[in-house]
Swiss-Prot record:
It is found in: Cytoplasm; Nucleus. Present with 1230 molecules/cell in log phase SD medium. Keywords: Cytoplasm, Metal-binding, Methyltransferase, Nucleus, S-adenosyl-L-methionine, Transferase, tRNA processing, Zinc, Zinc-finger. InterPro entries: Methyltransferase_TRM13, Trm13, TRM13/UPF0224_CHHC_Znf_dom, Znf_CCCH-type_TRM13. It comes from Saccharomyces cerevisiae (strain ATCC 204508 / S288c) (Baker's yeast). Residues 62-73 have a biased composition (Basic and acidic residues). Residues 55-78 are annotated as: Disordered. Belongs to the methyltransferase TRM13 family. PROSITE patterns: ZF_CHHC_U11_48K. A zinc finger (CHHC U11-48K-type) spans 72-99. This is tRNA:m(4)X modification enzyme TRM13. Pfam families: TRM13, zf-TRM13_CCCH, zf-U11-48K.
Length: 476
């Protein structure tokens, strides 16, 4: 084992002919596959990793090169990669992040901050959370649940027959994602979202590889093949895929492959393949209307979907839909609103943002109504604590831990008086915090989309996914 300048212990792998990084990855039981310089022991990324872990300079030189002390620093545009400090200026001009930041400059659907909260709050301002904030927030949560009568969300785990026939047989072991997709699709079916499938378009926010859209498309295609003869051949469907990241192994082609297979099995059905439009953009900066189809007299409708839309992206998405005149209000062509349904499976409330949260007034009203006399809680501090508490409901338990075990939840605060609860109580508090954030979103949707029903459901059991809450919005 090696240990450099008080850095983490590193197992030295056997030398190889290629100049391979000497860092040994214990979890994968192999050494790093990156190539290193002949003057260095490690690749640049593992050098940076070790420096972060040890909070010190790690020796990475052989011979006289050790005296030069070139330093690698995180790229200011993307801290996930590092550069030589003496080449930083040159790197910034050619960094891929520079190109990506200007990728949409000339696009009609791009407007910086369009779906943000107009700078109402600057979440970049650091808010220090104390043990007192944490304890008061927990006590306030209990009062909120008692006063607002927040019952447990209904479980609506449904099974889509197509998924059972086509998808589950392909998965002999891990079916958790398929079970979730099946339930979400069938909940959309029950909500009437697939009526008149020949004119349905879908928008998937935070689509990633678009696996969810692939199976939505598969169900849509089977519905099209079962249409009566008078409707055959008239379908015009589109999938708009929104994501800010670059994704590998995308499912876009699978949608076309599924169509080809279904078409070959039903050659007499004159159905058309759905078109696919993938847009790489942050939802914060997205104007939907330039992307969507809308002409007077058409019967096109849109269903907005997402499976595990992360943190603040859910708030930005709800604003994005509400800001679209084509989806939500009369557009410039005099057409009726095109929105038919919304289905968003939410996750990662711990990365929600108090400045961009969609319903500040709701959380503020809870704080003002239920905080104790002399409380130091404000909207900002309470929301920050909520995001921290949310992880308690989804982080799971360590092996051998019992639900009755006692934990001190303010242990990380130096000098704080102990505040002890059981493991089970901690999990419940996490779920309560998550519910408050989701409830505020639900209230926003009900106020904004008055012609729609809106509800929160548990679409699978928690043993399938701990992130098992979805918002379902459909026409009254």
């Amino acid at each position: 084992m090696l240990q450099d300048n008080n850095g983490p212990a590193v197992k030295r792998a056997k030398p190889s002919e290629r100049l391979q990084c000497e860092y040994f990855m214990e979890k994968k039981k192999r050494r790093c596959g990156m190539t290193r310089s002949s003057q260095n022991l490690y690749c640049s990324e593992h050098l940076n990793l070790m420096k972060k872990a040890a909070n010190s300079q790690v020796h990475n030189k052989n011979g006289s090169e050790a005296e030069k002390e070139r330093e690698r620093v995180p790229c200011p545009l993307d801290p996930n990669h590092t550069v030589w400090a003496d080449q930083l200026k040159k790197h910034l001009k050619k960094c891929n992040k520079t190109k990506l930041s200007h990728l949409n400059d000339d696009k009609p659907y791009y407007e910086p901050g369009y779906n943000g909260e107009n700078g109402l709050l600057s979440s970049s301002v650091k808010i220090d959370i104390t043990a007192e904030h944490l304890v008061q927030s927990i006590e306030l949560l209990y009062k909120v649940f008692e006063g607002e009568s927040m019952d447990e969300l209904p479980l609506r785990q449904l099974n889509n027959k197509l998924m059972s026939l086509k998808r589950f047989p392909q998965l002999p072991s891990n079916t958790k994602h398929a079970v979730q997709q099946s339930s979400l699709i069938e909940n959309l079916v029950d909500a009437g979202a697939f009526e008149r499938p020949e004119s349905l378009n879908f928008i998937e926010f935070g689509c990633g590889r678009a696996e969810f859209s692939r199976y939505v498309s598969l169900y849509l295609l089977t519905q099209l093949t079962s249409l009566p003869a008078e409707h055959s051949g008239s379908n015009s469907n589109e999938f708009v895929l929104i994501d800010r990241a670059t994704n590998r192994m995308k499912f876009d082609k699978k949608i076309k492959d599924d169509f080809s297979e279904i078409k070959s099995n039903s050659p007499s059905k004159p159905i058309s393949c759905p078109s696919i439009k993938r847009i790489k953009i942050d939802i914060r900066d997205l104007k939907m209307d330039p992307i969507l189809k809308s002409t007077p007299g058409d019967d096109i409708q849109y269903v907005c979907i997402s499976k595990h839309l992360c943190g603040v992206a859910t708030d930005l998405t709800l604003r994005c839909i509400g800001n679209s005149s084509i989806l939500h209000g009369d557009d410039n062509n005099g057409c009726n609103p095109k929105l038919k349904a919304i289905c968003i499976a939410m996750c990662c409330r711990h990365v929600c943002d108090y400045g961009d949260y969609v319903n500040r007034s709701y959380v503020t009203s809870l704080v003002e109504k239920y905080r104790a006399h002399g409380s130091i809680l404000t909207y900002e501090t309470f929301f920050r604590v909520l995001t921290k508490l949310c992880s308690w409901g989804t982080c799971g338990r360590k092996p051998g831990t019992a639900i009755t075990d006692i934990v001190n939840v303010v242990e990380s605060f130096e000098g704080a008086e102990p505040y002890t609860i059981t493991i089970k109580e901690r999990e419940n508090i996490g779920l309560m915090a998550r519910r408050v954030i989701d409830e505020g979103r639900l209230v926003y949707v009900k106020e904004k989309f008055t012609e729609f029903n809106a509800e929160l459901i548990r679409y699978v059991e928690s043993d399938v996914s701990l992130e098992n809450v979805a918002m379902l919005v459909y026409k009254k």
